[in-house]
């Protein structure tokens, strides 16, 4: 696997592949990789001739009092795992390479509406940071296809909307959430959990599953939501949000909506965990 922090190196290699008529898949990450990331890379390798991965802890998507400095950097282990998974090109830029003028002077991309609710309301500016870095990475790598995890459901919709609105010639593929044996969605932030918290963490998925089951049985959204919040609090969580939305627009769910998604974010100790479930009523 070739590794470089330099934009020109990435573009040169991708151009060489394209000159041979070969296809390129891209998996953007912030490193500290787990099996969910590796699954994205393996799916990308099935789809295209070559796989490019980026590792960049993006300061633009971290808010004040968030864990930018504490976010784990595990480049050596990540590189080994990516090589085994089938990645051929790894882009590891510094903030100075990505944002040479600094964040205050950086042109940014903002997807209105869908970026402002749920995680966007809890973390102002987060999705502006996500959209900006992903758009910039797309312009550097110029992939045919890009892969993202369905665990970050709102992020995936933001990126799909950006690609559509800006007419970017890139196919976006979402890959099912990879889970621990306990049912906990794999996340780099799971490393913040104590053993006691890890034992409690599966309550998040259980609460979401119970909400979906109740809605399918005709119980009101308000009732299932209150019951789920109570179960999370009893398990030691501090809920951030727990909501039922239209599956493609993230508008508040209406009685006539069939395609729904439950989205949840909750704190367990120092970790902010998110999860979701898309289902038909």
UniProtKB/Swiss-Prot annotation:
(R)-pantoate binds at residues 61, 155. Its EC number is 6.3.2.1. It is found in: Cytoplasm. Gene3D superfamilies: HUPs, Pantoate-beta-alanine ligase, C-terminal domain. It comes from the Bacteria. One of its GO terms (biological process) is pantothenate biosynthetic process. Keywords: ATP-binding, Cytoplasm, Ligase, Nucleotide-binding, Pantothenate biosynthesis. Beta-alanine binds at residue 61. The keyword Cytoplasm applies. GO terms for cellular component: cytosol. ATP binds at residues 30-37, 149-152, 178, 186-189. The active site is at residue 37. It catalyses: (R)-pantoate + beta-alanine + ATP = (R)-pantothenate + AMP + diphosphate + H(+). GO terms for molecular function: ATP binding; pantoate-beta-alanine ligase activity. Catalyzes the condensation of pantoate with beta-alanine in an ATP-dependent reaction via a pantoyl-adenylate intermediate. Homodimer. The reaction proceeds by a bi uni uni bi ping pong mechanism. This is Pantothenate synthetase.
């Amino acid at each position: 696997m070739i590794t470089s922090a330099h934009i020109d190196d990435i573009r040169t290699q991708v151009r060489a592949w394209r000159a041979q008529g070969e296809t390129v898949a891209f998996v953007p990450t912030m490193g500290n990789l787990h099996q969910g990331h590796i699954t994205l890379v393996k799916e990308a390798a099935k789809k295209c001739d070559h796989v490019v991965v980026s590792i960049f802890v993006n300061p633009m998507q971290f808010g004040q009092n968030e864990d930018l400095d504490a976010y784990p950097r595990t480049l050596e282990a990540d590189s080994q795992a990516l090589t085994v998974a089938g990645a051929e090109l790894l882009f590891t830029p510094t903030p100075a390479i990505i944002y040479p003028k600094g964040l205050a002077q950086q042109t940014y991309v903002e997807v209105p509406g869908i970026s402002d609710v749920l995680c966007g309301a809890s973390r102002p500016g987060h999705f502006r940071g996500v959209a900006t870095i992903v758009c910039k990475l797309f312009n550097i790598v110029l992939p045919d296809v890009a892969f993202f995890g369905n665990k970050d459901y709102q992020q995936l919709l933001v990126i799909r909307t950006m690609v559509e609105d800006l007419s970017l010639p890139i196919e976006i593929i979402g890959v099912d959430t990879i889970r621990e044996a306990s049912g906990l969605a794999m996340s780099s932030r799971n490393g913040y959990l104590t053993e006691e918290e890890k034992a409690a963490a599966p309550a998040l998925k259980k609460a979401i599953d119970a909400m979906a089951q109740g809605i399918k049985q005709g119980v009101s959204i308000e009732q299932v939501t209150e019951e789920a919040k109570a179960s999370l609090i009893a398990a030691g969580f501090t809920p951030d949000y727990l909501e039922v939305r239209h599956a493609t627009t993230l508008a508040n769910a209406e009685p006539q909506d069939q395609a729904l998604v439950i989205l949840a974010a909750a704190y367990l100790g120092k970790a902010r965990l998110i999860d979701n479930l898309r289902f038909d009523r």
